[in-house]
Amino acid sequence: MDITEYLGSWDRPLDFDSYWNKKLEFINSVPLDYELTEVEFSNFDNLKYYDLYFTSFDGARIYAKFIKPVSNGEVPALFYFHGYPGCNRNWFEKTAYASLGYAVFAMDFRGQGGKSQDIGGILGTTVAGHIVAGIDDELDNMIYVKNILDMCLLIRIAKDIEGIDANNINCAGGSQGGGFATMCAGLNDIKKCIILYPFLSDMKKVYDLDLDLVAYESIRY
C-alpha cells in the first residue's frame, strides 16, 4: 500500500457533500454567544491567557483555552485538537505555539473529561464509546457530528475576536486531534494543517486488520 496515494477503504457516501453543506449552512446561522475571562497564569508580558466558554447550537456550554500574543496588529490563529479520550493539557503545551506568534484555541471535546458539556442525556464525563454514541439515532445526534459543529462554531468565534487575522486560520493535532484537524481543514478555510497519526480516519481498515482495541474497541460491537 502506497500511503501517499491511499484514500481509505470506504466509499464516499453519496450524500456526503450535501449533508455537510447543510450542516455548515446551519452552524453559520447560529448566533455567537461567548465569554472570555482572563486567567492569571504566568508573568509573560507578551501573552494573555483566557478561559473561553461559548453556547453551542443545542445549548451545550463548550470550553476552550485561548492564548493571545500581545500585538499591535492582527495575529494568525492555530486551532489545536487533543487526543482521545481526554481533554486539553495544561497551558504550557499551548504556550509553545503562542510563543511563535499564534493565537491558540484549544477546545475540550464533549464528554471526554474536560470542561465542555455533553447534554445528550447526561451531564459529566464519559470514558469511552464516543465513536458509536448515537449510532442508532439520527445522524445529527451522533456525538462526533456535534463535536465537529462545535469546532466550526469556535472558528467563527475566533474570527469575531479583535486582533485575530480571519484570513490566517491554521489547525493541528495528533491522534483524535489529527482526525479533527483533517476535518477542520476540509470544512473550513484553513491556511495550514499539521496532522500527526490521525485517529478516526479509516475505522473499517482498523477493523479489517483486527486492531479494534483501546480507543477503537467500541466498533467491534
Identify the residue ranges that each predicted region occupies:
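N-terminal cap/lid segment of alpha/beta-hydrolase-fold proteins
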Residues: 27-73
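Short beta-strand element of the alpha/beta-hydrolase
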Residues: 64-68, 74-84, 104
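Residue in the alpha/beta-hydrolase core beta-strand immediately N-terminal to the catalytic nucleophile
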Residues: 154, 168-170, 192
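N-terminal targeting or regulatory segments adjacent to alpha/beta-hydrolase or S9 domains
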Residues: 1-47
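Active-site loop->helix "elbow" adjoining a glycine-rich segment at hydrolase catalytic centers
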Residues: 143, 175-179
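Hydrolase active-site cap/lid region
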Residues: 178-221
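Alpha/beta-hydrolase fold nucleophile elbow
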Residues: 162-175
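Cap/lid segment of the alpha/beta-hydrolase catalytic domain
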Residues: 89, 95-149, 205-208
